[in-house]
From Swiss-Prot:
It comes from Oryza sativa subsp. japonica. Its cofactor is Mg(2+); thiamine diphosphate. Residues 56-65 have a biased composition (Basic and acidic residues). Pfam families: DXP_synthase_N, Transket_pyr, Transketolase_C. One of its GO terms (cellular component) is chloroplast. Its EC number is 2.2.1.7. This is 1-deoxy-D-xylulose-5-phosphate synthase 1, chloroplastic.
Length: 720
């Protein structure tokens, strides 16, 4: 029996480092409608025609320091313009597309490695399928830059992730080619299945394709979706983009983090299971010719081959009802097109999963050799790979959190840390280096992370669960049912709270105060600076009779003195502090907004009024004594927070209303994020759009006091 074989070949720039490990050729099968068999081809390089002419890595890198010529890509504005290209031209298009991605991301920053890894796959998908009628969904969206370039947005790539520019993810309102908005992981199989079922109910015939990475496959939603897809049996295609990056490699310290979970092991076995393929082909051949008990025996041989040779990999997908094809070289356009065409032409087969193996950072040597594969980058010099990061006088809040947690763990061996595939993003890679047996990466699985932490708390440990504010939303039921209801002392470190700049609304931490402070047993706090963060880490460690959480922003500290060795001192729970004493007006800030209040106080003072500024520290429990004092001794009270409605200000208003503090002449105004999503942009632009700049706060003070002239002066000349 002739078998079509696929193998990964190194390509890209001359001088790229050899890939670790080995990808063994394996048969990609389609028993439902067999691929046309062809003789096994010699292993070949798919190096770009451009790179092949460059004799050194330096020449190849310098080639990208200026915008490289892209004569073929210049003729392709939309996928329709690709349809008549030859295979050789498609490869050239991929080479030029990769160069264009490198050039643009070097100017804007963004998610480079993921996009470089799917260039050939993107070309093949848009060549075979008729988008936008056919739907292609890109999970997470990190890898969508080549897709954007090929779908009418190349001229807007210089605006990527900037105010009023292109989103760094797929976005339905941006293009009809973006079938589904993304930013968080593991959603596309669910959405694609919904689209496929909706198509069937309407009698449509279009194709639906979900592209999902091996990292996203660690989330439970992906398996829930596959389970339902197998049951509903609607025609759809799932492409598993396997680049061995199950844990997001954000700013790793000691080289690439090993992929997390059993899935990684299963996929690795699938990549080297040629005996499995041959046994399965034999078994299928037998089952077509015989029946009865012998037929059942042959089927068992097939199942035995899967279990003994490949582990649970293909068994898992096929037991869920998805027809498995692969593994396939994700950088071989010829093979990709052949398989995609065959799957597209074969209808009424139900869901199909194509296992595609790619290399993150493909074709750019600095990305290929980097520990994080240049997952997310700032602007950089393509010729050297050096990123243009402004030197900072202080560390990031993320790093201060990590240092403070290490300080606690040094003194208490019950302190453990959990993150969801974000060791670099949460700073816990530093904790891992110091305490390798007390740091747990659970993969992209926030729901599991929360309940896993709850189990640790049941055993008397002190778990700190570090998760981005917007990502913790996925584990909210677990926070309620598994932690707060049982009053288990899990500590939630909510990173990226508030506005996050270029990553936009999908990553904005707007809602955490609202959804955490409504829980009866939760202690909710937020630091106003990096020293306060150290103290709140210590406070959380000391709270051992109930759950607690603290939020902190993206960005760097403000430069205040720090406690020795980052070891904080536990705060009195539910007690705030007054930072400035003034009259008539009190600004009660929460978290990072305290700094905006201090700056606003300076603006107001230039107009002859000195205001009081207080740091609430806690949203739950509130410092009722402090609020009574501020409300009774001032004409105006402003609560200021970088969070949504229903948060800190709402809790203050609830207390004041019940306490009768709003029955007199006090004027209370809440300053919060607007009740809408704020698009990506610079932090300064986002803060201005939200109306939370010091100028906005100062102007609000004078507007409430009836001094419109002063308010107008501040907004007209903000620093006046």
């Amino acid at each position: 029996m002739a078998l079509t074989t696929f193998s990964i070949s190194r390509g890209g720039f001359v001088g790229a480092l050899p890939q670790e490990g080995h990808f063994a050729p394996a048969a990609a099968e389609l028993s439902l409608h067999k691929l046309q068999s062809r003789p096994h081809k010699a292993r070949r390089r798919s190096s770009s025609s451009i790179s092949a002419s460059l004799s050194t890595e330096r020449e190849a890198a310098e080639y990208h320091s200026q915008r490289p010529p892209t004569p073929l890509l210049d003729t392709v504005n939309y996928p329709i313009h690709m349809k008549n290209l030859s295979l050789k031209e498609l490869q050239q298009l991929a080479d030029e597309l990769r160069s264009d991605v490198i050039f643009h991301v070097s100017k804007t920053g963004g998610h480079l490695g993921s996009s470089l890894g799917v260039v050939e796959l993107t070309v093949a998908l848009h060549y075979v399928f008729n988008t936008p009628q056919d739907k292609i969904l890109w999970d997470v969206g990190h890898q969508s830059y080549p897709h954007k370039i090929l779908t009418g947005r190349r001229d807007k790539m210089p605006t990527m992730r900037q105010t009023n520019g292109l989103s760094g993810f797929t976005k339905r309102s941006e293009s009809e080619y973006d079938s589904f908005g993304t930013g968080h992981s593991s959603t596309t199989i669910s959405a694609a299945l919904g689209m496929a079922v909706g198509r069937d109910l309407k009698g449509g015939k279009n194709n639906v394709v979900a592209v999902i990475g091996d990292g996203a496959m660690t989330a439970g939603q992906a398996y829930e979706a596959m389970n339902n897809a197998g049951y509903l049996d609607s025609d759809m295609i799932v492409i598993l983009n396997d680049n061995k990056q199950v844990s997001l490699p954000t700013a790793t310290l000691d080289g690439p983090a090993p992929p997390v979970g059993a899935l990684s092991s299963a996929l690795s076995k699938l990549q080297s299971s040629r005996p499995l393929r041959e046994l399965r082909e034999v078994a299928k051949g037998v089952t077509k010719q015989i029946g009865g008990s012998v037929h059942e025996l042959a089927a068992k041989v097939d199942e035995y081959a899967r279990g003994m040779i490949s582990g649970s990999g293909s068994t898992l997908f096929e037991e869920l009802g998805l027809y498995y094809i692969g593994p396939v070289d994700g950088h071989n356009i010829d093979d990709l097109i052949t398989i995609l065409r065959e799957v597209k032409s074969t209808k009424t087969t139900g869901p199909v999963l194509i296992h595609v193996v790619t290399e993150k950072g493909r074709g750019y040597p600095y990305a290929e050799r980097a520990a994080d594969k240049y997952h997310g980058v700032a602007k950089f010099d393509p010729a050297t790979g050096k990123q243009f990061k402004s030197p900072a006088k202080t560390l990031s809040y993320t790093n201060y959190f990590a240092e403070a947690l290490i300080a606690e763990a040094e003194q208490d061996n019950r302190v453990v840390a959990i993150h969801a595939a974000m060791g670099g993003g949460t700073g816990l890679n530093y904790f891992l280096r110091r305490f390798p047996n007390r740091c747990f990466d659970v993969g992209i699985a926030e729901q599991h992370a929360v309940t896993f932490a709850a189990g640790l708390a049941c055993e008397g440990l002190k778990p700190f669960c570090a998760i981005y504010s917007s990502f913790l939303q996925r584990g909210y039921d677990q926070v309620v049912h598994d932690v707060d209801l049982q009053k288990l002392p899990v500590r939630f470190a909510m990173d990226r709270a508030g506005l996050v700049g270029a990553d936009g609304p999908t990553h904005c931490g707007a809602f955490d105060v609202t959804y955490m402070a409504c829980l009866p047993n939760m202690v909710v706090m937020a630091p106003s600076d990096e020293a306060e963060l150290c103290h709140m880490v210590a406070t959380a460690a000391a709270i051992d009779d109930r759950p607690s959480c603290f939020r902190y922003p993206r960005g760097n500290g403000i430069g205040v003195p720090l406690p020795p060795n980052y070891k904080g001192v536990p705060l009195e729970v539910g007690k705030g502090r007054v930072l400035l004493e003034g009259e008539r007006v009190a600004l009660l800030g929460y978290g990072s907004a305290v700094q905006y209040c201090l700056a606003a106080a300076s603006l107001v003072e230039r107009h002859g009024l000195k205001v009081t500024v207080a740091d609430a520290r806690f949203c739950k429990p509130l410092d009722q004594t402090l609020i009574r004092r501020l409300a009774s001794s001032h004409e105006v009270l402003l609560t200021v927070e970088e969070g949504s409605i229903g948060g800190f200000g709402s809790h203050v208003a609830q207390f004041m209303a019940l306490d009768g503090l709003l029955d007199g002449k006090l004027k209370w105004r809440p300053l919060v994020l607007p009740d809408r999503y704020i698009d990506h942009g610079s932090p300064a632009d986002q803060l201005a759009e939200a109306g939370l700049t010091p100028s906005h706060i100062a102007a609000t003070v004078f507007n409430v006091l009836g001094q419109a002239r002063e308010a107008l002066a501040i907004m007209t000349v903000p620093n006046a």
